């Protein structure tokens, strides 16, 4: 087999083999464009078709999910599990329930997950799954029957040393509980095969808070290394769900002034900044009433920008926590005119063009595989607690989480340059790649 001699020939070959998968191709392009100079300096990583194997999932499982709705009608959905790479441990990654779910998105997420999990320093491989099922507006009975029907096929592909899923968009603690319960019934085994579980049956403290907390821990380390900090900074947060809420909570502890949140309907702007009391009000609307940001704005008498994202609001720090590709080149051109740092709380919320614009402008930029890895890290800590049949106090989990995020930041600096300004994209990509690649080379051609 002839191996590609340039990044463009490698990516062209990948595109021929994966047509009509834009999200996946974007993710691979972003990683390998930054990796290629490092690979050229280290030719050992071109041996054994390592790169070609690295971009091909080890296994893709696709199946139908047939279930009965509240009216007695049979519904059919499509579901997937992409078991991407197990070189350093069992496949690990969430199950996403959303109408947009397709193979391209799940391959992109599984690919990213492989490197993100490697960065945590915990023994976890990369995987991702999901279904085009939409839980919005559906009764608890419908959601339960769907989750149970899905598990009648998925259960045979899971195990504590094989594949350990978790929640994701549209798949929270309730859905994880339904799936974990059905898994236990089908397998007659109570071993840990899901993370993100409820505290009453093996969940970990700090898990709901982890991604948001970790995003702030990493961003603060990045700021501190460059002589900055959160105190007094104007912060734009996109999204208003779990990640956004706990990002705001931790940023407030560091005396930041968070002035935006958003959802698919538009953006709220609060120039006075969030407080603990305001955040509790937002959480009550979003988590208990399942309301919208517009409802919060109306009840508070605040500015609401219908149909707009937060990026037109002047800020010092931008933390995109909503969804992929929400921050494009046009938004980057606006926001970079004063922003000092951007850190990804969602998975790939910044387009390649926007990322390049930030880096060209000298803006500190933290990619999601590093900055939002804390959710995964805490999932790994949940697996460790389950394996030992113990539960740790919240303080212990939080301390471990802070250490893990500090280690990730250190690895990014080590590989991204220890000079005046670290290139965190290169650092994160190279650090994750090296760990996975070394494991694959050591294990032979598989």
Swiss-Prot record:
Protein name from the UniProt record: NADP-specific glutamate dehydrogenase
Q: Which GO terms describe its cellular component?
A: cytoplasm; cytosol
Q: Is NADP a UniProt keyword of this protein?
A: yes
What reaction does this catalyse? L-glutamate + NADP(+) + H2O = 2-oxoglutarate + NH4(+) + NADPH + H(+)
Any Pfam family the entry gives:
ELFV_dehydrog_N
Give the Enzyme Commission number: 1.4.1.4
Its biological purpose is as follows:
Catalyzes the reversible oxidative deamination of glutamate to a-ketoglutarate and ammonia.
Residues annotated as the enzyme's active site: 128 (proton donor)
Q: What UniProt keywords apply to this chain's record, in alphabetical order?
A: NADP, Oxidoreductase
List GO BP terms, alphabetically.
glutamate biosynthetic process
Tell me the organism: Unknown prokaryotic organism
Q: Which GO terms describe its molecular function?
A: glutamate dehydrogenase (NADP+) activity
Binding-site residues for NADP(+), renumbered to this chain? 211, 242
């Amino acid at each position: 087999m002839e191996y590609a001699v340039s990044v463009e020939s490698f990516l062209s070959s990948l595109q021929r083999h994966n047509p009509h998968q834009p999200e996946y191709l974007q993710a691979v392009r972003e990683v390998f464009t930054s990796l290629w100079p490092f690979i050229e300096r280290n030719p050992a990583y071109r041996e054994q078709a390592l790169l070609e194997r690295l971009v091909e999932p080890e296994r893709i499982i696709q199946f139908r999910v047939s279930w009965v709705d509240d009216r007695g009608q049979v519904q059919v959905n499509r579901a997937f599990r992409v078991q991407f790479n197990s070189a350093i441990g069992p496949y690990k990654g969430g199950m996403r329930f959303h109408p947009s779910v397709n193979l391209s998105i799940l391959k992109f997420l599984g690919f990213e997950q492989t490197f993100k999990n490697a960065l945590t320093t915990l023994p976890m491989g990369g995987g991702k799954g999901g279904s085009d099922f939409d839980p919005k507006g559906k009764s608890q009975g419908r959601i339960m029957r769907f989750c149970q029907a899905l598990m009648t096929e998925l259960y045979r592909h899971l195990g504590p040393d094989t594949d350990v899923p978790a929640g994701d968009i549209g798949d929270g603690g309730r859905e994880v509980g339904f799936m974990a319960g059905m898994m236990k019934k089908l397998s007659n085994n109570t071993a840990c095969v899901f993370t993100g579980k409820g505290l009453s049956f093996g969940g970990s403290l700090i898990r709901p808070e982890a991604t948001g907390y970790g995003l702030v821990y990493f961003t603060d380390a990045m700021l501190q290394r460059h002589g900055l900090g959160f105190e007094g900074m104007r912060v734009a947060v996109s999204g208003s769900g779990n990640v956004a809420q706990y990002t705001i909570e931790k940023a407030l502890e560091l005396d930041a002034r968070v002035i935006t949140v958003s959802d698919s309907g538009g953006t709220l702007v609060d120039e006075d900044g969030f407080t603990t009391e305001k955040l509790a009000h937002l959480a009550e609307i979003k988590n208990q009433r399942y309301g919208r940001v517009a409802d919060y704005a109306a009840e508070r008498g605040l500015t609401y920008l219908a149909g707009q994202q937060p990026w037109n609001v002047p800020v010092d720090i931008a933390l995109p926590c909503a969804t992929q590709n929400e921050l494009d080149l046009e938004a980057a051109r606006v926001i970079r005119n004063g922003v000092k740092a951007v850190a990804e709380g969602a998975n790939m919320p910044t387009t390649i063009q926007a990322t390049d614009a930030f880096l060209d402008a000298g803006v500190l930029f933290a990619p999601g595989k590093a900055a939002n890895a804390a959710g995964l890290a805490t999932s790994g800590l949940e697996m460790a607690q389950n394996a030992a049949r113990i539960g740790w106090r919240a303080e212990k989990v939080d301390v471990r989480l802070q250490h893990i995020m500090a280690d990730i930041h250190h690895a990014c600096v080590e590989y991204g340059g220890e000079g005046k300004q670290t290139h965190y994209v290169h650092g994160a990509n190279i650090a994750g790649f090296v760990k996975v690649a070394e494991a694959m080379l050591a294990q032979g051609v598989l």
